[in-house]
Amino acid sequence: MKKLVLLVFVFFCSCHSNKKEENNSKAQLNSQQILPPQPYFLDIKVNDVKLGEPVFGDWLFSHKEKGQSFEQFVRTKHVVPTKEEDIIYLKPIGQFNSSQLKQIELVRQYLQIFFQLETKVLENASNDIIPNHARRIGDVGQEQFLAGYILTDVLKEDSPDKRIALMAITEKDLYPKPEWNYVFGLASYRDKIAVSSIYRMQKEADFNLCLDRLLKICSHEIGHMFGLHHCIEVNCVMNGTNSMVETDRHSIRLCSLCQRKLNTGFKYDNVKRLKELEKYFKDNNLAEGLQVTKKDLKSIQ
């Protein structure tokens, strides 16, 4: 009997940096001075919403994670933008309708604001790049692609100019192993590549709900590529999730601690980022994102 997949993403690599990376960087970073947080991060901390006790079905109910302090983040090797690598790429695979293409473009715009890095959409690739041995018919007659093949045979060798992260988006359903029903996506954080399927996000005739899910999943996965572990204390886009229901329940906002981590290597203007997020959410009628961003802006005035 096939296993029912509840995980939004099956991780090709652990979300945590491996021991070898930690040991290699520990000697260099152990003496690094940890500066106190800037006033910005203290000001917006008031808007962090503490997570309640996990219940059956929640990610933290079945995954006893330890979290990641700011000090642990700083003293662990992670990816930061350089002049040679500072562009995020999205690679569509398949035949998308006009609404889906619009969503992919809106994801591009959002990621560019969220990470304050140039983000580009590569030329659409045909489903024909997936061979028969990496395809199957799913339990309700839908065609599925083997997610691991897309990572290792499509994305790993794809090196567009100045690539810092690459995420494929496919309109076909995905599966990670023969015995699993499906998976929403798969990622290799070591190689800074991931693939996500919009197939199961599109069931409801609700453009904004599907867009909101894409924004959360893409920013979450790319956040992992930049060294952010799962957030276990407050409602945050970096929370782990076991289902689409849990994804919908979690915030699109990056909490004050995760923002501070990201900003250490990216050195962007936090206020500029917030104002751009506010405009994006307003222009696209995304109420939850607009609400939490307005709260942060009010807190820093």
Segments (PLM) and residue ranges:
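Active-site-proximal segment of zinc-dependent metalloprotease catalytic domains
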Residues: 159-225
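Short loop/turn motifs enriched for small/polar and acidic residues
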Residues: 91-93, 170-172, 241
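A structure-centric signal for secondary-structure junctions around beta-strands
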Residues: 84-87, 163, 190, 252
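Short, well-structured alpha-helical interface segments that form or flank functional binding sites
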Residues: 102, 106, 209, 213, ...
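N-terminal low-structure segments adjacent to metalloprotease catalytic domains
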Residues: 15-158, 165, 274-301
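Metalloprotease/metallohydrolase-associated module, dominated by Zn2+-dependent proteases
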Residues: 23-54, 184, 191-204, 212-213, ...
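Sec-dependent N-terminal signal peptides
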Residues: 4-12
